[in-house]
Amino acid sequence: TGGAGFIGSHLVEKLVKQGHKVKTIVPYNINNSWGWIDTLSQSIKDNIEIISGDICDQSFVLKESKKIDIIFHLAALISIPYSYKSPKSYITTNVVGSLNMLEAAKENNVELFVQTSTSEVYGSAQFIPITEKHPLNAQSPYAATKIASDQLAMSYYNSFNVPVLVLRPFNTYGPRQSLRAAIPTIISQIVQNKKK
């Protein structure tokens, strides 16, 4: 899931280049856009099965996850500021959507479920370097939904033996990234200061 996004589009591209069969769920939209997948070369796009749909639709994800070896779950609402304005939409997409994907992984006996989380689950650092032992401390509705999703993933491992890997990336950056993210903002500020 999340193949249309910043990290997801890079993952999709890399998996195709490595010769894997790739299927991704992208949100339906009236523009018929596949997000960042639209910018990939045609030879890459020709090797991706793209399904438009909603991870909040349990029967849809259950059906589309059949005969899948690994689920890379990256789909999420990610804007921290917007999470304060619409926390329920974050719970629906980030928590219920993750639950649906975990249930699909369980029912379809996937070999591995990769839950993509965020460093935001740690809040302000209580010690550095931050390790997995750092306390979880949601400082936004977004972070709270990611903690809930991570804990659901671990519960599916503990309760149902669904093989789970939780990734918590810190400040990813690169091509296709939103200019509002931390690293592009810092770079933009440096460039602006040099022009003064």
Where would I find each of the regions flagged by the language model?
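N-terminal Rossmann-like NAD(P)+-binding domain of SDR-like oxidoreductases, especially those catalyzing
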Residues: 1-172
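Glycine/proline-rich active-site loop of Rossmann-fold NAD(P)-dependent oxidoreductases
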Residues: 147, 172-186, 193-196
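Juxtamembrane helix-loop transition sites at the ends of transmembrane segments
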Residues: 47, 138, 189-195
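Generic alpha-helical structural context detector
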Residues: 103, 154, 184, 188-192
